[in-house]
Regions:
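Sec-dependent signal peptide recognition
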Residues: 2-10, 14
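Sec/Tat signal peptide C-region and signal peptidase I cleavage site
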Residues: 14-20
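Flexible loop/hinge segments at secondary-structure junctions
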Residues: 20-139
Length: 139
C-alpha cells in the first residue's frame, strides 16, 4: 500500500517527469485484462496477477475501449487545474463524472477516479478497477 501511495504521489506532483514516463512505459509490458478478469479483481478473487508495482494502476484502466489515449492524456494533464474545474462542475450540479461520460474527456474521468480512490477507499486499486469497469461498460 505504501508503494501505491508513493506512486500516486509521484504522479500528482511530477506529471510529465521521468517518473510519469516510467509508469507509462511499465504499462506497455502488462497485458490487457478482460471484462471477466476485471469482475474477478473487483470481487477480490484474484490478486496475484498484480504484483507489478508501477504498472498496476495503469492496467486496471487500460482495458478494451479504455485505450492508451486515456492514459496518455492523464499523464499529460495539469492535475490540479482539472480537479478544480471538475469539482466546480460537480458542486454546481452541472456534472456527474461517471454519468456524463459521453460529454467528459477521459482525462477528467481519470482525475475523478484517482481522487475518489485516494479519498474514499481503503483499497484504492479496487476502487479504480470498479470505476474503470463502469467506464468500459458505458462506452
Amino acid at each position: 500500500m505504501k508503494k501505491l501511495m508513493a506512486l500516486l504521489g509521484a504522479w500528482l506532483f511530477l506529471l510529465g517527469s521521468a517518473e510519469a514516463q516510467e509508469v507509462w512505459m511499465a504499462s506497455n509490458s502488462v497485458p490487457n485484462f478482460s471484462h471477466q478478469e476485471l469482475v474477478a479483481l473487483i470481487e477480490g478473487r484474484t490478486r496475484q496477477s498484480f504484483d507489478s508495482g508501477a504498472a498496476t494502476l495503469v492496467v486496471y484502466l487500460e482495458n478494451q475501449e479504455v485505450t492508451r489515449r486515456f492514459i496518455e492524456e492523464f499523464l499529460q494533464l495539469n492535475y490540479f487545474r482539472a480537479l478544480y474545474q471538475l469539482r466546480e462542475q460537480i458542486n454546481s450540479g452541472r456534472a456527474s463524472p461517471l454519468l456524463d461520460v459521453p460529454e467528459k474527456d477521459d482525462a477528467y474521468i481519470a482525475v475523478f477516479a484517482l481522487e475518489q480512490a485516494m479519498t474514499y477507499s481503503d483499497d484504492p486499486i479496487q476502487q479504480l478497477a470498479e470505476i474503470g469497469l463502469q467506464i468500459v461498460e458505458m462506452r
